[in-house]
Structures are given as structure tokens and as C-alpha cells.
């Protein structure tokens, strides 16, 4: 029987919602409407029904919204109604109608309510709310007047993920934690234990679990869950308990992505030293829960390391420049990885599934994996893939997005996905091939086949599953296109040495490569987490003392983290 194998996505925390916003914006950018013609064949596009659901709003209009549950603090939604903008009995006010009075402006609102079908004038009760701040991009979006060439300066002005959100959500998607207001200077939900306590509160738990159930009951063949969450604060505890609930109730595959902020995390009433200790405890408890509850998890950060990194040393990607601690820009990179890495089991014509994808890169119980990214991919204009890979030699194609982690080039198990490389860029026709004919890779007949051969030759004793689609990463608004260097062409290829894009032109799309990797060397990442725990004096952490975390509970988590690390010993390989 042919049916959709759906995935339900979760986003816990502010940074997770930054990443998720870019991810959903990318999905919308790939939608096709009407007679739009693209170079990408239908079967090479994502099957949007895996992540989206069709419904009808109060006006009996068809909606198509992400199958998503998002959790964040009060104060992050700004102008965005908690019910979203496609449902509900509210009317979005025009800028010129603010503030609302009892005169002509009110009559205009009544007329608009009647025309939109929300209710009749007799049924209309007007309750005016104070004006919420709204970004220039969102204001233009509401008026359907976004100018793609306009510089909205989102990197400098975005104060929340809603400022650059293009996708529209279902009423059950947004969940705001009561009594916790976002503070840019400190984490309001500070500790892992605070997150677990929040999950156990009846006011939150019952409604949230009901929303999960409603989503699941709509599915024909639910295959699993994507879980993005901030691991440095209490949202890790919330996500951990949610994973436990999902396993108990639904027994489906779960791919978790713990996200580290690209800046030094602060907590209420804690100096730098105490803040570091709180973050260590949060990570220890979070990793322990992930090792038990997730089928696979991949820590993500644009920082080289998250421990004792006071200078915020960031990873670097050739052809890109970004502000190290900018949430809007860094989250776009993590979202690009997430979107590309998961394409292999989201394409319309693919035998892959989330379960098989996870199992292929987690041998011997090694649930933790690493993330590799190449954005843009690095091909020069007019260059074929066979030449690019031949000239790369031992030079790594990928930059790591898992902090403090280098999987190496031996005994690696990995899933690699390439996007945006057209089939005609694979190699030259035989009559024009020249030296390419002497290369073993010339026998390859697809992008994925050639990548598989490349890693077979350059990664000793490794296993690679490669997939490819000609669909590039779309980098128009609201993606932070300003990150691309001048030496990158509009379609994301490297220009000749010294050449630059036309002044005022922007990169519209880019080829890229993403990989989920596993090897014995990932044990070093777990060693780093455990090493930091020696500096922690749990009794001095008032935030944890108040939450009731027992020393025995913490020691048990540490011991089991060491047992999990033992799975990455050489003797456990395959």
C-alpha cells in the first residue's frame, strides 16, 4: 500500500526555534506552485507530506502547515499570535489603523471581519491589544510586499526567530511556557532539572501530550520524530522527558539534535564560573538521557569547542563569513545541515526511512554521531565533479559542526548527501573527456556513485552511504545571503581567482554537502564532557540544590556516560 510515512518535529528552546525557522523557510522555498518550471525533476524533490499536514481553517480554506510542536519562553512570539496566523478569530490590523479608535477605523475593522468571514458585525466584539514590535521584513510580508532585492538587515535587527519566519503554523504548534519570560542576558529556564519539572506540571503536560496525540492520530504511517533542542539550559530536560514519553507511547525512531548556543551562556544569579558548572551539569544529564532515549543524536554548534572557549573561536567555512555569536546567521548554517542531511529519506522516490538512516550510522550502539558540512560545496564555475574530487586529494571536503570533534578518515561510518550539483557537472562526454578517461571515477554514472567511490578510496576501512539531488540550497530572503563572500557566484560556485560577483548581486542558491558520521574518535567528545565534570561542585550550585537533584542521581549519570563512551573504543568497532 502506498502511503506517506510522516515525521513529527519538535523544537524546544529559543535557539532551536531559530534553527527550525530557517529549516521551515527552506521547505517553503522548495514548494512548487502551478506551472512553475524548474530544472529539478519531481521525483528528486522532497515529499512535503512527510513533514507537512493538510487542514482547513475556520473560513473553510485549505491550509498546509508543518507537523510541528514548538516550545519557547514568553516574549519570543512578538507580533505572532499563539494560534498562528491562518486560524483563529482575529483580524490582522494594518499599520495605518494603529492605534484603533471608535471612529472610522473601527468601522473598517468591522467591515474586514465581515468580508473575511470571521463573524457578522452583530457578533463582533472588539478587544484591542497593545501594539507588538514587528520587524520590517514581517511588516512587508503581511502586506505581501516583500522586495527580494531590499536589504532588511536581519542579521543586525532580528531580535527573535519570528522576525524572519516565512512559514505559517497550525494553532497547536506554538507552546509558550507560562511565567518564564525571555531574558537576553540569562537563561530563564536555567537547569536541566527545571525542564523536567516543567514537563511534570499538569498545566503543561496534559495539553502538550494531547497535541502530540492529535498529530500522531492524523498520520497514516508515522515513521518517527525529529527533536531539536537547546541542551545548554532547561530545555534539555524538557526534551529528554519528551523523548521518554515518545518511546513509552509510540515506539518510533527519534533523531535528536542537541544545539549549543554560539555564545557564552549565562544563568540567573550565577557568575561566569558557576554558569560554566551549570552548563556542564546540563550537558551531562542531557547526554545521559539521549544515550538512553534517542535512536541517534548529533550535537551541533558553529563553535570549535564549547568548553573554556572564552574567545568564542568559531569554525570556518571557505566562502562564508559570519558573526560568531549571531543567532540569525549561525542558526542558518545548522538548519542547512539538518535540511540536507535528512533529504535522503525525505525525497519523493526513495526507499530510505528515518529508522534505516539512523541504524546505518550507529553501529554497536554508538548513538552519538558527528555533523560535517560543506557550504558552498567548492566547485569552480565550469568545473566537473570528477576534477574537483581528483584535485582535492587528502584535503577534507567537510567542516565539522559537532564541537570538539573530528571523526578522522579511517574506520568511519557515514551517510553523505550532496545537493545542487547538476548531472551534467559529473564529467565530460567521452569525446571531450581527455584526461578524465584515465580516472577510475569516469566509470561512475551518478553524483552519489562518484562520492561513494571517492570516500572508498580516501577513507580507509570506512563505510559510506551516499545520496544526491540536483535541488540546491535556496539562499534568497530570509536566508542570510550576506554571509557569502564576493568570490562566490550567484549560483553558489567559486569564481576564478580574483574575480567577484557583480556589485549588488546576491547568491540565490548554492550546492552543498552534508554528512552524518561515526567513528571511534567521537569518544574524545564524550571524554571532554566528562573531564569538565571534575571541576563541578554540585553542592555549590544553588540552582540545582533548589531543584532537588541528588548527588547520587548525578553520579549515576556520569557513570553511565562513561559506559556509553566505552562503546567508542576500537574493540567495539563493527
Swiss-Prot record:
The cross-references to InterPro entries, in alphabetical order and at most eight, read: DML1/Misato, DML1/Misato_tubulin, Misato_II_tubulin-like, Tubulin/FtsZ_GTPase_sf
SUPFAM superfamilies referenced in this protein's UniProt entry, alphabetically: Tubulin nucleotide-binding domain-like
The main location class comes to: mitochondrion
One Gene Ontology BP term is:
positive regulation of mitochondrial fusion
Deletion phenotype, per the entry, is: Irregular chromosome segregation during mitosis leading to death before the third instar larval stage. Larvae show abnormalities such as absence of imaginal disk tissue, and reduction in brain size.
Task: Quote the Pfam families the UniProt record gives.
Answer: Misat_Tub_SegII, Tubulin_3
Q: Which GO terms describe its cellular component?
A: cytoplasm; cytosol; mitochondrion
Q: Which UniProt keywords apply?
A: Mitochondrion
Q: Where in the cell is it found?
A: Mitochondrion
Q: State any further remark.
A: 'Misato' means 'beautiful dawn' in Japanese.
Give the family from UniProt. Belongs to the misato family.
Official protein name in the record: Protein misato
Taxonomic path: Eukaryota, Metazoa, Ecdysozoa, Arthropoda, Hexapoda
Q: Which gene encodes it?
A: mst
